[in-house]
Design a protein with these regions (language model features):
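C-terminal segment of classical bacterial N-terminal signal peptides
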Residues: 14-23
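Beta-strand-enriched accessory nucleic-acid recognition/scaffold domains that flank the catalytic cores
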Residues: 90-91
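Bacterial N-terminal signal peptides that target proteins for export
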Residues: 1-10
Length: 148
């Protein structure tokens, strides 16, 4: 019996070495097939997605960059009556010196009050989504025609 258990453990160990699991958490997730609604905050049943076509650079200084985008509540239950609902505008602030990332929204005027939440966990989905959001915001802002 002991040899069977040792053999089974060896098999499982070698199998794990031969077929390592992929790190799926490092891949950005999208709510739609067109990859326009990027999920930046997620749970098991629902999350938040930003509309990449709405992302723009609001402020760009030597100290930080602020990006705004329309934010949506998304539910992963496809049978839900409204799988996607508009929430508000979400703002991301990146410190250029420290690379710290902060988030706030229009909800309860938090952006206007200057209330920012620092993202401390490097493994959150926001860390994987932010570079994509930033790239699109810069691209979208360049495409805005100058007003005369």
């Amino acid at each position: 019996m002991r040899r069977i258990l040792q053999g089974l453990c060896a098999f499982v160990f070698l199998f794990a070495l031969a077929f390592p699991l992929q790190d799926v958490s490092a891949k950005p997730m999208y709510f739609d097939d067109a990859q326009n609604y990027l999920i930046w905050d997620t749970g098991t049943h629902h999350g938040s997605a930003v509309d990449l076509s709405s992302a723009v650079v609001v402020k760009d200084t030597p100290e930080y960059i602020i990006i705004a985008a329309l934010d949506y509540f998304v539910t992963y239950d496809k049978s839900a009556e409204y799988p996607m609902r508009s929430k508000n505008t979400v703002y991301f602030k990146e410190s250029k010196q420290s690379a710290h990332l902060y988030v706030t929204s229009d909800f309860q005027n938090r952006y206007q009050k200057g209330e920012w939440h620092k993202i401390t966990n490097i493994y959150t989905s926001i860390r994987h989504a932010y570079p994509i959001l930033k790239e699109r915001a810069i691209q979208n802002t360049k495409n805005i025609p100058a007003q005369s």
